[in-house]
C-alpha cells in the first residue's frame, strides 16, 4: 500500500469500461484509494446499453490478468470455448482450422456482461468509489487536477496522486499528452467498416456448430460469427465502405448475400436480414499508436487510450488487460514506486502495443483471403509439425500471440526468423527433389526424351509463384 503522509495515495481511473474497471480492482487490491469515473450511466442498471458490441475473444493474456484479481474462473464460465476456425466457402462447404493443440481454445464473451461483472467486482472493494455520468472535460497532469461535468450539468473539480486514463480510443486524458513536447501520436481509419447481424437459435439450440469462430472469407471482405450463451450467434460483416454504400435496398442486400453468403440466409432469415442490415450505418474502425504512455509519475494511459487496435486478432481487450497486469507486476517489483513504474511501463509496453497493432492489420488479410488458399493450410500443417518436434523452438504465430505471454514485439521477431528458416527448408527440399529427379532422368531416359523433359520442368518452375518469390528475394 502506498502512503503519503498519513493517508493512502489516491488513484483516479478515468473510464469505467473493461480496462478501467479491471484496473480499479488491481489498484484497490494494492490498498490505494481508488476513484473511478465513467461518462456513461451505470450499464448494470441502464435500460439500453450503447456503444460497441462486437463480441470479444478472451484468451491467455486476458485470463492471466483476470486470474491475478481472482476473476478468471467466474469470467471463463461466462464464455463459450472456440477451438477452431470454421471456414464457409461460397458453395456452402465447411472446413475447420484448429487454433492450436486440442486443449487450446479462445472464449467468446459478451462485452456488456463482462463489463458489468468487472464493475461489480471493483465495487466490492471498500476503497473503491464509483462516479457515473461524470464526463472528463479537462485535466492538468502536472497538478493532478481534473474537471468533470456530471449529469446535473455541474462542474466538479477533483484531484489525485495518479491519473490513469482508460477512456478509450478518443481519450480526453491522452489529449493532455499531446500538449507536451516529444509525444508521438498517429491514428488510422481503415477503409473497411462493419455491420452486426444475428443468427437466432433454431428450436432452442445453436443453428451452427457452437465451438467455432465461423468465417466467410471473400478476399476483399468477410463475415464472422461468434456464439453467445443464449444459443444465438453474433455475425459481423466487415467490408469496404464503398461496398456498403452500394447496398441501399432490401433486394440488393438479399442478392448480395445470395451471391457471397448463400448458406447464411436461411440461418439469419430473409426478413430479419433485410431489417437488421439497415438498423445502423456501417461503423468505422480506428487504429491508434502513440508514445510515451506516461507523463512523469502523475499520469499513465492504458488500453485503447494508449493503443486502440482493429479487432482482427482478438487482442484489443487482451492487450488492455495485460497492461493492467504488467503495471501491477512492476508495482510489486519496484515496491509501488510510481516514478519508476510509470516510465518502465511505457518503455516495455510501447513496442508491444505497436507490434500488436501491426499484427491485427496483418491478420485481417489472413482471415479474409489467406485462409482460402491451399498454401495457407499447408504452411499451418508445417508449423504444427515443427512445433510438435521442437515445441520450444518453433511456435506458430497464432499460438505465440494467443496462448502465451511472449511479448508482442518478440513474437514478430521470432515469427520472421521462423518464416525464414521454413522458407529455406522448403526451398532446399524442393531443390533436392528436383536434382534427384534430374539424376534419374539423365540416367534412365534416352537423350531426346531427356531434353524434352528438362524443357517441361523449366516451364513448370517458371510458373511456380512460390519459387519465383524466393528467387526474387
Curated annotation (Swiss-Prot):
Its EC number is 1.14.13.9. Gene3D superfamilies: FAD/NAD(P)-binding domain (3.50.50.60). The chain crosses the membrane at residues 385-404, 425-445. Keywords: FAD, Flavoprotein, Membrane, Mitochondrion, Mitochondrion outer membrane, Monooxygenase, NADP, Oxidoreductase, Pyridine nucleotide biosynthesis, Transmembrane, Transmembrane helix. GO terms for molecular function: FAD binding; kynurenine 3-monooxygenase activity; NAD(P)H oxidase H2O2-forming activity. One of its GO terms (cellular component) is mitochondrial outer membrane. It comes from the Eukaryota. The keyword Membrane applies. L-kynurenine binds at residues 85, 99, 363, 398. Pathway: Cofactor biosynthesis; NAD(+) biosynthesis; quinolinate from L-kynurenine: step 1/3. It holds the Pfam family FAD_binding_3. The keyword Glycoprotein does not apply. GO terms for biological process: 'de novo' NAD biosynthetic process from L-tryptophan; anthranilate metabolic process; L-tryptophan catabolic process; NAD metabolic process; quinolinate biosynthetic process. Its main location: mitochondrion. It catalyses: L-kynurenine + NADPH + O2 + H(+) = 3-hydroxy-L-kynurenine + NADP(+) + H2O. Its cofactor is FAD. It is found in: Mitochondrion outer membrane. Catalyzes the hydroxylation of L-kynurenine (L-Kyn) to form 3-hydroxy-L-kynurenine (L-3OHKyn). Required for synthesis of quinolinic acid. Belongs to the aromatic-ring hydroxylase family. KMO subfamily. This is Kynurenine 3-monooxygenase. It comes from Xenopus tropicalis (Western clawed frog).
